[in-house]
From Swiss-Prot:
This is Flap endonuclease 1. DNA binds at residues 47, 70, 158, 231, 233. Mg(2+) 2 binds at residues 179, 181, 233. It comes from Drosophila mojavensis. Keywords: DNA damage, DNA repair, DNA replication, Endonuclease, Exonuclease, Hydrolase, Magnesium, Metal-binding, Mitochondrion, Nuclease, Nucleus, Phosphoprotein. The lineage of its organism: Eukaryota, Metazoa, Ecdysozoa, Arthropoda, Hexapoda.
Length: 388
């Protein structure tokens, strides 16, 4: 789930923290990728006539097709990916996982109704909602990555937290995921849409953690409390408090404890036994493997091994697999090239550019404040409605 409404809040109040780029602009970068998020995307998106790709026995192969060709695309663009797989979820995530299970049950019932009615569009919609990444999917992806010569890391707990640890240790440049909580874990850079298909023509969105804090005018601890207030995977949020109200409260009171002492609890309903302190601990000190002990190596692909793994029962086209393997080898041989900016120290922004950017941010904030003033007579419930 990530953090509810965080990307929009940053876009509104800290626009300078976001930069859109083409994938080729990340040439020479090492990037830690949330593997489970990728596999889910591939199972959803890589389809033929609305259905997942599968073997004659019905075993899905969409995740392998997506992993193989999207990884080749990254390497073709000079990016060195390392995939990070989820470990055991923290106990505090049990509530969120239970909610997901309930939504799956609802989707299964809706799918049955759609199937009985013969509604193809609804059938496809609810089939997509029932997609989940299994341990078998992950194990197959790991085997594929080994054969491709691409490193992966098994996180002891949350993949986003392990990605953030790799970034903070300087092992990689950024975390690539669609979950915004990578920023809450302190990833210096977050990349969204990096593993999207080329056909979607989505520019990569790069979020800079330092600029997020600067634009929102928060410390790292205050930012974590903001994310908890907005809604995270580890605990419920206070009913009636949406993103804009959450940041107003954090800026006024600076932490959740002081907010709880000052808000009207008849208007804002605090969850019973609200475990926000434990959620905060999970963001501040997540369970991760020490990045200094992780050795990342990109090696030559095993062409024959790839053919054996992907062709045959999985029915991949052998010629295409061998062509893919040759592309992998070519990218491996060209990895000696480095980014030009690694030789130079970055110059500070010019005063004119900095001033113009600051004016833009102030205009956005002023516009948001004007809207708030016009709607201040509305009910707290309306202001606290969660974005979809």
């Amino acid at each position: 789930m990530g953090i509810l409404g965080l990307s929009k809040l940053i876009a509104d109040l800290a626009p300078l923290a976001i930069r859109e780029s083409e994938i080729k602009n990340f040439f020479g970068r090492k990037v830690a990728i949330d593997a489970s998020m990728c596999l889910y995307q591939f199972l959803i998106a890589v389809r033929s006539e609305g259905a997942q790709l599968a073997t004659v026995n019905g075993d899905p192969t969409s995740h392998l097709m997506g992993m193989f060709y999207r990884t080749i695309r990254l390497l073709d663009n000079g990016i060195k990916p390392v995939y990070v797989f989820d470990g055991k979820p923290p106990d505090l995530k049990a509530g969120e996982l239970a909610k997901r299970a309930e939504r799956r049950e609802e989707a299964e019932k809706a799918l049955k109704v759609a199937t009985d009615a013969g509604d193809e569009a609804e059938i496809e919609k609810f089939n997509r909602r029932l997609v989940r990444v299994t341990k078998e999917h992950s194990n197959e992806a790991k085997e594929l990555l080994k054969l491709m010569g691409v490193p992966y890391v098994d996180a002891p707990c949350e993949a986003e937290a392990q990605c953030a640890a790799l970034v903070k240790a300087g092992k990689v440049y950024a975390t690539a995921t669609e979950d915004m909580d990578a920023l809450t874990f302190g990833s210096c850079k977050l990349l969204r849409y990096l593993t999207y298909s080329e056909a979607r023509k989505m520019p990569v969105k790069e979020f800079s953690y330092d600029k997020v804090l600067q634009g929102l005018e928060l410390t790292s601890k205050e930012f974590i409390d903001l994310c908890i207030l907005m809604g995270c995977d580890y605990c419920d949020s206070i009913k009636g408090i949406g993103p804009k109200r959450a940041i107003e409260l954090i800026k006024t009171y600076r932490d959740i404890e002081t907010i709880l002492e000052n808000i009207d609890t008849s208007k804002y309903i605090v969850p019973e036994n609200w475990n926000y302190q434990r959620a905060r601990e999970l963001f501040v000190e997540p369970e991760v493997t020490d990045a200094s002990t992780i050795d990342l190596k990109w090696t030559a692909p095993d062409e024959d091994g790839l053919v054996q793994f992907l062709c045959g029962d999985r029915q991949f086209n052998e010629e295409r697999v061998r062509n893919g393997a040759r592309k992998l080898l070519k990218s491996k041989q060209s990895q000696t090239q480095v980014r030009l900016d690694s030789f130079f120290k970055a110059l500070p922004s010019s005063p004119n550019a900095t001033a113009a950017a600051k004016r833009k941010a102030e205009e956005i904030k002023k516009s948001a404040n004007n809207k708030k003033a016009k709607t201040s007579g509305g009910s707290g419930a309306a202001r606290g409605r969660r974005p979809k």
